[in-house]
Structures are given as structure tokens and as C-alpha cells.
Amino acid sequence: MDDCGAILHNIETKWLYDFLTLEKCRNFSQAAVSRNVSQPAFSRRIRALEQAIGVELFNRQVTPLQLSEQGKIFHSQIRHLLQQLESNLAELRGGSDYAQRKIKIAAAHSLSLGLLPSIISQMPPLFTWAIEAIDVDEAVDKLREGQSDCIFSFHDEDLLEAPFDHIRLFESQLFPVCASDEHGEALFNLAQPHFPLLNYSRNSYMGRLINRTLTRHSELSFSTFFVSSMSELLKQVALDGCGIAWLPEYAIQQEIRSGKLVVLNRDELVIPIQAYAYRMNTRMNPVAERFWRELRELEIVLS
């Protein structure tokens, strides 16, 4: 028996479920209650798992408890392994195939509305969908911690390398726009002093891009009027005539065509963006792997 075989021989399946429960609860007491065992027994089982595989899975020096870097990788692998085992058992017993066909995706807010409907409509009817629209940074955390099969997000250097895999979906741009008046002219312009800015949250992906652009162009004089992490909300506030927003091209095409929004033409203020699908580079369950293959072949159409 090789080393890996010996490790597997010494691991009990219940320890793996203990591990997933502790990652979810981030607290030994709560996880022990959830697993219906005493806390000392639960702690011993987690320690036994760590000793069996030879790494510490949790950083116990922080509150709440956090996965270690090795723990994040292990979590993704074990979650997929147990999901596949449960799926196979359900199939053998003639159970519902909903869980077997489910694809779990976490997506940036703007991509969940601007991209996912197009992708789902082009997919074969093999999958059921569980979609969560969240902030970009939170989506990345879910991928790292194995809570999503894949995420739809934006360019991230850290996710373009191992232990991740990626598919480049499309390129787009952020345009500075505002509402039009009754004559079709822009209500605001970038040269006016203290123009009202409708901005993304400071720590969001698009917020960081826009703030870097504003810093480079110190000649712009603005006063932040409204802040949100959601492109659709910023678009609505812009349509209501409240200020200037940088919005993704794919989210405003209809409003530009109808004249409800006006692009404020300053080429140097147009910001390029790239959207990607990311996953862990460990093997997923067969349904998720099929989805990934289909996604690679897909022609992305944004309307």
C-alpha cells in the first residue's frame, strides 16, 4: 500500500463530515452540537483527521476559526468527493436527480444579471442551477473555501495560477454615463466642478478601478453622492438623473440605444474590464466537469 493509500485507510468518513461542519460553523462548540457529539470528542476527531493527513487544516489563532491554506485546498477536494459519493448512492437507490445535476455558481452582481441568463439559455438541459449573486471578493472566498463549483468574476492575477483554472469569458468597458434631458443632452459633464459621482463601494473590484482612474485624473472635480456595490442599482440612480456613474457596457446597451443614458466621451476615462470563470484545478464531480467543458465551447452573447 502506498503512502496515499495508507492515509485513506486511516481516515474515517465521519471525520470528513466533521471537517465540513467545522468549516461552516467556524466554532468547535457549535460544530459539535451540529454533529451531535461532545466538544472534546469532536475536537479529538478533527485532530485525528489532521494527524492522518499530516497538515493543520485550521488556523486556531484567529476568531472566528479560519481554514489554513492547506485546509482551503482540502475543503474543495473533500466537498466534491463527498458530493459525488452521495450522488452515486442516491442514483443507486433511485433518488431524485436534482442534487446530482446541480451546478453551484457564485457570481459578481453585474455578471449575474448581464451574463448568466445568456449562459444558462445556451446550455443543454442537463443541469439544475443554484446561483448566488455576491460581491467579487466574497465570490473569491467562496471558491477558495470550496463553497461553489465555480465563480464568475473579473480579472484576478491570483486566480489565473494554480491551484485554480479559468476560462476567459469576454472583454468589456466601463463608460462614464449620465441621464439625458428632454432634448437628449447629458444632464452633467465631467468638466463641471463638483459633479455628483455615483460610485462603487471602495473595496469592490470596479470601485478600485474607478478610484484609480479618478486619482490619475486629478483635474476631475466631483462630490460622491451615492455608493453601492451593485451595477444595476447605480444604473437606476443614474437614470433618475442623480449623477455620473461608470457602468459596464453590457449593462447599459439598451439605455444607450434609447437615449436614456448618454456616454460622456472621454476616451482616456473609459476603463477596460475582463470577465472570467474560475474553478479549483482539482477534479470536480462529473456534472460540474461537464458544465465546465460546455462553458469552454460557449459563445458568449451579451445583450
Swiss-Prot record:
Belongs to the LysR transcriptional regulatory family. It comes from Escherichia coli (strain K12). Residues 11-68 form the HTH lysR-type domain. This is HTH-type transcriptional regulator YjiE. Disruption phenotype: Controversial. Hypermotility, up-regulation of flagellar genes and up-regulation of flagellar protein FliC. Decreased viability following HOCl stress; no effect on motility was seen in this study. One of its GO terms (biological process) is regulation of DNA-templated transcription. The keyword Transcription regulation applies. Forms dimers, tetramers and possibly dodecameric complexes; oligomerization may be governed by cellular concentrations. DNA-binding seems to decrease oligomerization. Pfam families: HTH_1, LysR_substrate. Residues 28-47 bind DNA. Gene3D superfamilies: 3.40.190.290, Winged helix-like DNA-binding domain superfamily/Winged helix DNA-binding domain (1.10.10.10). GO terms for molecular function: DNA-binding transcription factor activity; identical protein binding; transcription cis-regulatory region binding. Keywords: DNA-binding, Transcription, Transcription regulation. Disulfide bonds: none annotated. InterPro entries: LysR_subst-bd (IPR005119), Tscrpt_reg_HTH_LysR (IPR000847), WH-like_DNA-bd_sf (IPR036388), WH_DNA-bd_sf (IPR036390). CDD domains: PBP2_LTTR_substrate. Induction: Transcription increases throughout growth and is maximal during stationary phase. Is not up-regulated upon exposure to HOCl.
